[in-house]
Amino acid sequence: MPLSYQHFLKLLLLDDGTEAGPLEEELPRLADADLNRRVAEDLNLGNLNVSIPWTHKVGNFTGLYSHTVPIFNPEWQTPSFPKIHLQEDIIDRCQQFVGPLTVNEKRRLKLIMPARFYPNSTKYLPLDKGIKPYYPEHVVNHYFQARHYLHTLWKAGILYKRETTRSASFCGSPYSWEQELHHGRLVTKTSQRHGDKSVCSQPSGILSRSSVGPCIRSQFKQSRLGLQPHQGPLATSQSGRSGSIWARVHPSTRRCSGVEPSGSRHIDYSASSTSSCLRQSAVRKAAYSHLSTSKRQSSSGHKVEFPSFPPSSARSQSQGPVFSCWWLQFRNSKPCSEYCLSHLVNLLEDWGPCTDHGEHHIRIPRTPARVTGGVFLVDKNPHNTAESRLVVDFSQFSRGITRVSWPKFAVPNLQSLTNLLSSNLSWLSLDVSAAFYHIPLHPAAMPHLLIGSSGLSRYVARLSSNSRIHNHQYGTLQNLHDSCSRQLYVSLMLLYKTYGRKLHLYSHPIILGFRKIPMGVGLSPFLLAQFTSAICSVVRRAFPHCLAFSYMDDVVLGAKTVQHLESLYTAVTNFLLSLGIHLNPTKTKRWGYSLNFMGYIIGCWGALPQDHIVQKIKDCFRKLPVNRPIDWKVCQRIVGLLGFAAPFTQCGYPALMPLYACIQAKQAFTFSPTYKAFLSKQYMNLYPVARQRPGLCQVFADATPTGWGLAMGHQRMRGTFVAPLPIHTAELLAACFARSRSGAKLIGTDNSVVLSRKYTSFPWLLGCTANWILRGTSFVYVPSALNPADDPSRGRLGLYRPLLRLPFRPTTGRTSLYAVSPSVPSHLPDRVHFASPLHVAWRPP
C-alpha cells in the first residue's frame, strides 16, 4: 500500500498514540466533518478573520497588482528584427510538402492569413499617453529608446505608419489584401483645385499618392499625421509641432504629415524632385517667405481638420505666427542659456527629413490621430538585461463591460504531455524568432491597435513642472524655450552620440498601427497556438517516425537516434524557412534524452518540474512567515508556484485547499507551524508523474451511500459504512480500497468525479489521503449497468456478472498524433526510412 496510515496521522500530528485499525475502518473517519473541523482549528486553517495587519510581501512575492519597480538601463540595445514575411500561400506550400491537409489544419492556417481583430468598442487616448512615463528619472532617455524601438519595428514591416486619416505606409513585402489601390501603377494626375498643382508620379507604392476622389479630399482635410511623399530625405515635414517646412515639398500632392498652416494649399510647388539635396538653410528661408505670405488664408472653403491635439506649438496654425518644425525652430532663435537646445540644433547643418516614408501606401479605415494603448520598455528577459523588450498595453480590450472575451484554446495537461513526450527519444527544441510578429493582421484592424507618441516637445512639456503650457500662449517664442533645461540638454547631447541626426526624426509625433499581431492583446496567444500546432501537425505527418510538438513559440522535435534527429532537424528547418518562419539557429537546444519543456523535465521515467522551479519553492518555504496573516493576493502568488508542482507531491492539490479557500474569501491566511511543516515536507520530496501505459482493466470498484464492493479478477468483496456517506465520497473510498487491496494501477469506476482525479471538493483530510493512495492510478469509465462491482456494493455476492475486457488507452489530450491524412497522391516519396519509434513508444489508437 502506498501510504502507511500511521505515517499520515503522524504527518498531520493527529496521532494520539492509539493503534490505527485497517484502512476500511480508518479511511471513512477522515470524511467525518467533525474531525476535519477539529484539524482545521488545530492547524489554524479556518480562522479567516484576523485583526493583525496583513503581510504584503513574502520573499519575492508581492501582491498581484503591486508595482515592482522596473530598472531602466540607459545602455539597452534595441533587438534587431529579421524581415519576417510569412508566405501567403502557406496552405499550398504545406500541401506540396505533405499532401492534402486535414480540415483542422486548413481551418487553423486560414485563421492567421490574415488575422482579424474587430472589438465592439475602442477607446481613443491622446497621443501624450503613447509612451508611458514609466521611468520618471529617465524620461527623455526612455522616450528616445522607445521611439527608436518603434522605428525599428516599422522598418522591419511589423507596424503601419498612419499617414492620413485614411492611408498608411509600411516597409517590407505587401500581402494581397494590402494592395487595394492602383496595384503599383504609375499614375500622373494634375488637380487644379484651389490653385494647387499636384503632380504625382510614383512607381513603387501601392496606393498612388494622388489617388482619386475621396483621397484628394483627404489631402485637404488632413489630420495631424498626414500622408507624405517619400521621395528623398527632405520630404514634407512631419506632423509638426507647428506646421511644416512647406518649401521642402516635391511635386507630389501636398500631403503633409502634420497639422499644416491652413493657407498652405495656396502654395504653388514647382520644386523638382531633385531638390531633396537642398541644404535646409535655403529651405528654411523659402519656407518662411512662403509662410509669411500665406499665413492666414484659410478661405478656400475646405475645412482643415485640427482634432484636439495638444503639442506645445501645434495651435500655432490658428493663433500666432507659424513656424517650421519644433526642432528646427531653435536654429533661428537666440540661445536662452548655456543649456539652450539651439546649441545642439546648430551642431548639424542637415538634420534630415522631418518624417520617414514607407515603401508602400495602402488605404485603411478612418483612423483618428490618437492611440489606443501605451508602450514602455523593459529588460528582454531576466537573463538578458542588455537588450530591451517593448511592452504594449492594450488592456482596455480586457476591461469593463465592452471587454472582448478571448477565444479559449486547449493546452495539454501534465498527464497528456507526459503520455505524449515521455519516451526514449532524443530531443531538440527550435527557437522561433519574434514568433508573434510572423502572423499578419488585416489592415482593417489598424484603427483599434494604435500606438505612437506626441513628439518630444509635448512629452517634455507635459512632464516638466512648468505650468506655462496651460496658459494658452501656444506658438510664441518664449514658449519655445520653455522646454530648455540643463537635464534635457545633457540627455539630448548624450543621445546625440547614439542616434545622431535621427534625434530630429524621433522628436516628431507619430502614430503607428500593427501590421503583425501585437503581444498585448488576448487574441495573439490563441492565434500563435493555432498556427504552431497546425504546422507541427503537418510535420508529424510528413515524418511519421518522429515527433514534433509545440506550445506557443516553443517547438520540439524528437527522434529515435541522434543521427536521425539531426537529419530531421535539417529537413524541418528547411521546410519552416520555406514557409517564411524565422528560426534562430544559435538558440537551438539539444536536450539528449530528457527534454526541458513548459517548465518540466520530461524523460522516459516521466516528468518533474525544472530545477529552477524547485529552487524557487525551497526559497519560498524558507521565507514563509509563521503565525502572520498574509495578504490573499500574496497567497495567490504562493499558490501559483506551489500549484505548478502539486501533481508531483504525495497529497497533490488537496493539500493546498485551505489556501484556495482563503483566496476565494479574499481573506488573509495565517500559516501555523504545523501546516507549514506539512506543506514543506510535501514539497521537499517530489515524485515524477509517469507515463500511463495502455492495458486491460481487471479491477472494478463501486459504492452506494451505505456500502462498497470490489471485483478483482474472479474475486468479489463487499463492506458497509458505519454511517451513510455522500455518494461521491463513498465512490472515492471504494476506489481507494480497490487500489490498496489489489495494487492494480488500472481501476474501473462509474463515478465521474473519481475519474476526473480532482479530489479538491472532498473533506480535506480525505482528499489528501485519497490523492496519496491513488497517485499513479489510471481510471477507466465503466457504465453502472456493466460494472461487475455493482452487485457486491449492494450486498449481493452470489450474482456474478461476467468480467468486462475494458481496454485503457492513455490520452494525449487534443494533440492528434495520428491525424489521418486525406488520400495522398502516390508519387510522394517517404521521407526517411528508419525503424519507427512511434511503434515502440506509442500505440496508434
From Swiss-Prot:
Gene3D superfamilies membership:
3.30.70.270
Q: Which GO terms describe its molecular function?
A: DNA binding; DNA-directed DNA polymerase activity; metal ion binding; RNA-directed DNA polymerase activity; RNA-DNA hybrid ribonuclease activity
User: Is Magnesium set as a keyword in this record?
Assistant: yes
Superkingdom as given in the UniProt entry: Viruses
> InterPro entries recorded for this chain?
DNA/RNA_pol_sf, DNApol_viral_C, DNApol_viral_N, HBV_DPOL, Rev_trsase/Diguanyl_cyclase, RT_dom, Viral_Replic_Matur_Polypro
EC annotation from Swiss-Prot or TrEMBL: 2.7.7.7, 2.7.7.49, 3.1.26.4
Task: Give the start-end ranges of region Terminal protein domain (TP).
Answer: 1-179
The entry summarizes how activity is regulated as: Activated by host HSP70 and HSP40 in vitro to be able to bind the epsilon loop of the pgRNA. Because deletion of the RNase H region renders the protein partly chaperone-independent, the chaperones may be needed indirectly to relieve occlusion of the RNA-binding site by this domain. Inhibited by several reverse-transcriptase inhibitors: Lamivudine, Adefovir and Entecavir.
Stored PROSITE patterns: RT_POL
- Domain Reverse transcriptase residues, every copy: 359-602
Which keywords fit this entry according to its UniProt record? DNA replication, DNA-binding, DNA-directed DNA polymerase, Endonuclease, Host-virus interaction, Hydrolase, Inhibition of host innate immune response by virus, Inhibition of host RLR pathway by virus, Magnesium, Metal-binding, Multifunctional enzyme, Nuclease, Nucleotidyltransferase, RNA-directed DNA polymerase, Transferase, Viral immunoevasion
Q: Where does Mg(2+) bind?
A: 431, 553-554
Keyword Nuclease tagged: yes
Composition bias, Polar residues? 199-211, 290-301
Region annotated Polymerase/reverse transcriptase domain (RT), chain positions: 349-692
**Positions of region (Spacer):** 180-348
* Catalysis: reaction(s): DNA(n) + a 2'-deoxyribonucleoside 5'-triphosphate = DNA(n+1) + diphosphate; Endonucleolytic cleavage to 5'-phosphomonoester
Pfam families reported for this sequence = DNA_pol_viral_C (PF00336), DNA_pol_viral_N (PF00242), RVT_1 (PF00078)
What is one process in the GO biological process aspect for this record?
DNA replication
Known function: Multifunctional enzyme that converts the viral RNA genome into dsDNA in viral cytoplasmic capsids. This enzyme displays a DNA polymerase activity that can copy either DNA or RNA templates, and a ribonuclease H (RNase H) activity that cleaves the RNA strand of RNA-DNA heteroduplexes in a partially processive 3'- to 5'-endonucleasic mode. Neo-synthesized pregenomic RNA (pgRNA) are encapsidated together with the P protein, and reverse-transcribed inside the nucleocapsid.
What PANTHER family does UniProt report for this protein, alphabetically? PEPTIDASE A2 DOMAIN-CONTAINING PROTEIN-RELATED, POL PROTEIN
The record's domain comment reads:
Terminal protein domain (TP) is hepadnavirus-specific. Spacer domain is highly variable and separates the TP and RT domains. Polymerase/reverse-transcriptase domain (RT) and ribonuclease H domain (RH) are similar to retrovirus reverse transcriptase/RNase H. The polymerase/reverse transcriptase (RT) and ribonuclease H (RH) domains are structured in five subdomains: finger, palm, thumb, connection and RNase H. Within the palm subdomain, the 'primer grip' region is thought to be involved in the positioning of the primer terminus for accommodating the incoming nucleotide. The RH domain stabilizes the association of RT with primer-template.
Name the protein family: Belongs to the hepadnaviridae P protein family.
Q: What else is known?
A: Hepadnaviral virions contain probably just one P protein molecule per particle.
Name assigned to this protein: Protein P
Q: Which organism is it from?
A: Hepatitis B virus genotype A3 (isolate Cameroon/CMR983/1994)
